[in-house]
Curated annotation (Swiss-Prot):
The modification N5-methylglutamine is found at Q254. Peptide chain release factor 2 directs the termination of translation in response to the peptide chain termination codons UGA and UAA. Keywords: Cytoplasm, Methylation, Protein biosynthesis. This is Peptide chain release factor 2. The keyword Protein biosynthesis applies. The gene is prfB. It is found in: Cytoplasm. SMART domains: PCRF (SM00937). The gene for this protein contains a UGA in-frame termination codon after Leu-27; a naturally occurring frameshift enables complete translation of RF-2. This provides a mechanism for the protein to regulate its own production. Belongs to the prokaryotic/mitochondrial release factor family. GO terms for cellular component: cytoplasm.
């Protein structure tokens, strides 16, 4: 192997070793390692299951800690071993081993970039699960079909990221598509990844519902908010709530819901409305709807505080109906984020859930 290529490998490995050490400091590796020992000890005690909720919380914390501790441990050891092996292989002019180390360096780079990306998650709610609301805009069938395309896109994205996704509510369109839907996404940093998707998404295409093949523009809004837990205090006065029950909508068949199990809760002071119909139990639907309401109220309060403290310009604080964030122009094979100017020509890949280029750019630019 030529000397210049060897020098590049050596420089990369040295750089990765420095970055790995910097990440240990930034991500509190030592403190997390100690905490992981404590959590493991608690989980090994059979008495922990006397309080199932506490045990589940510990299980989630363990997974989160292991995600950092194990990754950094393996990465640090891997880079150190590669550096040592590189010295031997270079001295012996062992090209096969040097090429293998070069391939390992590519893997180290990917893992480092994944950990470094976590530095973008500055919001205290970023590690939490989240809810994602989709609402079709004006325009009837065309807009409702677009809303259903977005629903599919985010479900595909969840699949790619390894998130658990559950459709809690889905209101069908009159002819095709959906009027609205709510998804619950569970996974590490689900809210952190998806929070910059809040806004209006614009579709331009030749409509399949127009026999003349005319070009149509449609809009749908997306709103993402974290699932809050007991560590986030959200007070809800029962007197401020109006609770309605209704029969869940659906295509029918032998499993059609014959009872009024779907629940809609209106928070009258804020005007926030949430609904849940995914379970046959009215009690469980009500509990899920209350969780959604508390999460929305928390996100609303956080946005108010952010606006007051940072006085961000309108383009960053306005998440109303008129705030377009992304334009999907399908007949020109172009999807462009209007905040970061990231543009992708492979429209089908994006609609199949490959949103990482947009999301990463948004987080890096602090959108």
């Amino acid at each position: 192997m030529e000397a210049e290529r060897q020098n590049q490998i050596a420089a990369r490995l040295a750089d990765y070793a420095e970055r790995e050490q910097a990440l240990r400091r930034y991500l509190d590796y030592d403190a997390k390692t100690e905490r992981l020992h404590v959590v493991n000890a608690e989980l090994e005690d059979p008495a922990v299951w006397n309080d199932p909720k506490h045990a589940q919380d510990l299980g989630r914390e363990k997974k989160s800690l292991e995600d950092v501790v194990q990754t950094l441990t393996e990465l640090g050891q891997g880079v150190a071993d590669a550096l040592e092996l590189f010295e031997l292989a270079a001295a012996d002019e062992d090209d096969a081993t040097l090429e293998s180390i070069e391939n390992d360096a590519n893997t180290f780079q990917e893992r480092l970039e994944g950990l470094e990306f976590r530095r973008m998650f500055s919001n205290p709610a970023d590690p939490l699960n989240c809810f994602l609301d989709i609402q079709a805009g004006a325009g009837g069938t065309e807009a409702q079909d677009w809303a259903s395309m977005l629903l599919r896109q985010y479900l595909k994205y969840a699949e790619r990221k390894g998130f658990k996704a559950e459709v809690l509510e889905e209101s069908e369109g009159e002819i095709a598509g959906i009027k609205s839907a709510t998804i619950k996404l569970e996974g590490e940093y689900a809210f952190g990844y998806l929070r910059t998707e809040t806004g209006v998404h614009r579709l331009v295409r030749k409509s399949p519902f127009d026999s003349s093949g005319g070009r149509h523009t449609s809009f749908a809004s997306v709103f993402v908010y974290p699932e809050v837990d007991e560590s986030f205090e959200v007070e809800v006065n029962p007197a401020d709530l109006r609770v309605d029950t209704y029969r869940a909508s659906g295509a029918g068949g032998q499993h059609i819901n014959k009872t009024d199990s779907a629940v809609r809760i209106t928070h009258m002071p804020s005007g926030i409305v949430v609904q849940c119909q995914n379970d046959r139990s009215q009690h469980r639907n009500r509990a899920e709807a209350m969780q959604m309401l508390k999460s929305k109220l928390y996100e609303l309060e956080m946005r108010k505080r952010m606006a007051e403290q940072q006085k961000l310009e309108d383009s960053k604080t306005d998440v109303g109906w008129g705030h377009q964030i992304r334009s999907y122009v399908l007949d020109q094979s172009r999807i462009k984020d209007l905040r970061t100017n990231v543009e992708i020509s492979n429209t089908q890949k994006v609609l199949d859930g490959d949103l990482d280029p947009f999301i990463q750019a948004s987080l890096k630019q602090g959108v």
